[in-house]
Amino acid sequence: RHILSACKANNIKRILHISALNADSKGPSHYLRTKGEAESYLMTYGKRIANITVFRPSVIFGKKDSFILRFSNLLNYTPFLFPLACHNTKFSPVHIDELSNFIVNSIKDTKSFGEVYNLCGPKVYSLKEIVELIIETKNRNIKVIPLSNSMSKLQATIMEFVPGKPFSIDNYNSCQVDSTCHSDHSFYSDLE
C-alpha cells in the first residue's frame, strides 16, 4: 500500500514486483500467503496507478544467495550424516543473472504489462539432489538421510529455536508444494 502511494505521489508509471512461485493468498505457508496477498492487492489497485509486471521465480541461486548458502553453511557443521527434511520437494532453480536479465528486458516491453510470469530454470531437482550437488561441490563425504514427513515437521519445530532459524515450520509448510513450472515461461539457468 505504501509503495503504491509513493508511486502515485511521484508519478511513477512502472512497477516490477518480484514475488514467489506458488504465491497464493490461500497457500500452505505464511510466506506464500503474504506473497499472494501482495500480488492480489497490487494487481487490483495498482493497475490504476502504473503498468505492473509480477515475477514469480522458483528458488533463486547465485553468488551469496540465501538458499544454497544456507545448506552449504549447515554442511560445514555436519561430520558425515545430514538429516534432510522435505527431501522430495521439487525445485526448478533460477540463476540470479538469468532472472535479472528477464526482469530488465521486461521494463519497456508493453506485452509484459499486467502479466504474471512463473519463472523456472530448465531442470527440476529434488531438495535431496540439490543438497547432494552442494556436498559434491564442497568435496565432502556426507550421506544425506531423508526424513519422513513427521520427522521433517519435528525437525522444523526444533530448528525454529536454533539461532538464525535455518529451517522453520513455515519453510516446512512451503515445501509441501513443489516449486516448479508447468506450462508457464521458463528460461535457461544451470545449477551444475
What is the meaning of each model-derived region?
Residues 28-39, 61, 65, 69, ...:
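Short-chain dehydrogenase/reductase
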Residues 19, 40-64, 69:
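Conserved beta-loop-beta element that borders a ligand/cofactor-binding pocket
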Residues 1-15, 33-44:
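NAD(P)-cofactor binding segment of oxidoreductase domains
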Residues 106-168, 181-192:
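Mid/C-terminal beta-alpha module of Rossmann-like enzyme folds, strongest
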Residues 66-68, 86-108, 115-118:
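Substrate-positioning beta->alpha
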Residues 14-17, 53-59, 92, 118:
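Structural signature of the Rossmann-like NAD(P)-dependent dehydrogenase/reductase core
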Residues 23, 60-62, 99:
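Conserved sequence/active-site signature of Rossmann-fold short-chain dehydrogenase/reductase
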Residues 72-85:
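A short C-terminal helix-loop "cap" of Rossmann-like NAD(P)-dependent dehydrogenase/epimerase domains
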